[in-house]
């Protein structure tokens, strides 16, 4: 005989609750019914899932293996049911989105009107933070971030890849000259980040093939500020291409050291806590970002 969802639900609840009585209370069932269902499940499987003592319950080796699988199955069933129910729902409510200012200005804000036209009942709240934040403490539903995840409690949806470019304004180059090698950057005014210091190691390689670390003449906490400084002729900067592509196309900024620039790309992700995965307004926003940014940005 095959197991059914009721047996999986009861077994998982017993394990998570730590006792038959607490599981029965949470499931609104009699203790005897809970015990009988778990026993029936064990008989179907032909193994003992639980070690029973008068003081506590514990999983057998087979029980631990089965519990992990049963838990995942129930989560997938719940997610599938939610998705089917959501087909007839209208995405609505407030969606709080956090990102560094350059991403807000150059990626999110230009798409806001289109998103609002498609989903008029979702109210976007755009917040700017330069560093990593605790999404729960800040009451943020989703954040856009560069780089890999270092929080195992987060999920990520890949949006696009970006390269870094070294650029300067025509005015700066006319006054100070154009560097022809990475080493010549030492004689120029380089613009860098206040923090983290790792962003001041640029994506250009020196004669030994190593990334070049600058000594900034000006520093700022935001890539958008550095872009403004660069546009005003204050110096040379290294920024992500999504931030400066339009300026380059319009002739406001000039790419430098193309042959020495690394081809390495950096992932940009939308990150959120895993328990937000079935939130309908979050899901449609993620799909929208992947559609728009994936189609319109290239690494």
UniProtKB/Swiss-Prot annotation:
Tagged with keyword Transmembrane: no
Gene Ontology biological-process annotations: DNA-templated transcription
A molecular function GO annotation: DNA-binding transcription factor activity
One matching Pfam family: LysR_substrate
UniProt keywords, alphabetically: Activator, DNA-binding, Repressor, Transcription, Transcription regulation
NCBIfam families: trans_reg_YafC (NF040888)
Subunit structure: Forms oligomers. Forms an octomeric ring-like structure in solution. May form hexadecamers when bound to target DNA.
Ways its activity is controlled: Activation and repression activities are enhanced by the addition of alpha-methylene-gamma-butyrolactone (MBL), an inducer of NADPH:quinone oxidoreductase.
Protein family according to the UniProt entry: Belongs to the LysR transcriptional regulatory family.
UniProt keyword DNA-binding, yes or no: yes
Name recorded for this polypeptide: HTH-type transcriptional regulator CrgA
Domain (HTH lysR-type): residue spans on this chain: 1-60
CDD domains attached to this UniProt entry: PBP2_CrgA
Induction of synthesis: Negatively autoregulated.
Free-text domain note: Each subunit contains an N-terminal DNA-binding domain, connected via a long linker helix to a C-terminal regulatory domain.
Reported function: Regulatory protein that activates transcription of mdaB, encoding a NADPH:quinone oxidoreductase, and represses its own transcription. Under the same experimental conditions, no regulation of transcription of pilus and capsule genes is detected.
InterPro entries (alphabetical): CrgA-like_PBP2 (IPR048071), LysR_subst-bd (IPR005119), Tscrpt_reg_HTH_LysR (IPR000847), WH-like_DNA-bd_sf (IPR036388), WH_DNA-bd_sf (IPR036390), YafC/CrgA (IPR049755)
């Amino acid at each position: 005989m095959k197991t059914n969802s009721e047996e999986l639900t009861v077994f998982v609840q017993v394990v998570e609750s730590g006792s038959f009585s607490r599981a029965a209370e949470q499931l609104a069932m009699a203790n005897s019914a809970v015990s009988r269902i778990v026993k029936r499940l064990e008989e179907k499987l032909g193994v003992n899932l639980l070690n029973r003592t008068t003081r506590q319950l514990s999983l057998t080796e087979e029980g631990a293996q089965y519990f992990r699988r049963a838990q995942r199955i129930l989560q997938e069933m719940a997610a599938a049911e939610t998705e089917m129910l959501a087909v007839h729902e209208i995405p609505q409510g407030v969606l709080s989105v956090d990102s560094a200012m350059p991403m807000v200005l150059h990626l999110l804000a230009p798409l806001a009107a289109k998103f609002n036209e498609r989903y008029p009942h979702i109210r976007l709240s755009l917040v700017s933070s330069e560093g990593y934040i605790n999404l729960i403490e800040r009451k943020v539903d989703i954040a856009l971030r560069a780089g890999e995840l270092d929080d195992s409690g987060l999920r990520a949806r890949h949006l696009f890849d970006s390269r870094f470019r070294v650029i300067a304004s025509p005015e700066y180059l006319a006054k100070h000259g154009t560097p022809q090698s990475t080493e010549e950057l030492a004689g120029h005014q380089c613009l860098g980040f206040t923090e983290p210091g790792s962003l001041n190691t640029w994506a250009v390689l020196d004669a030994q093939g190593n990334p070049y670390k600058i000594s900034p003449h000006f520093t700022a906490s935001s890539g958008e500020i550095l872009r403004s400084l660069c546009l005003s002729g204050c110096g040379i900067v290294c920024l992500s291409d999504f931030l400066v592509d339009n300026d380059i196309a319009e002739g406001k900024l000039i790419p430098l050291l193309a042959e020495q620039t690394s081809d390495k790309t950096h992932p940009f992700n939308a990150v959120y806590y895993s328990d937000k995965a079935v939130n309908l307004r979050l899901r449609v926003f993620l799909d929208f970002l992947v559609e728009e940014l994936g189609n319109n940005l290239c690494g």
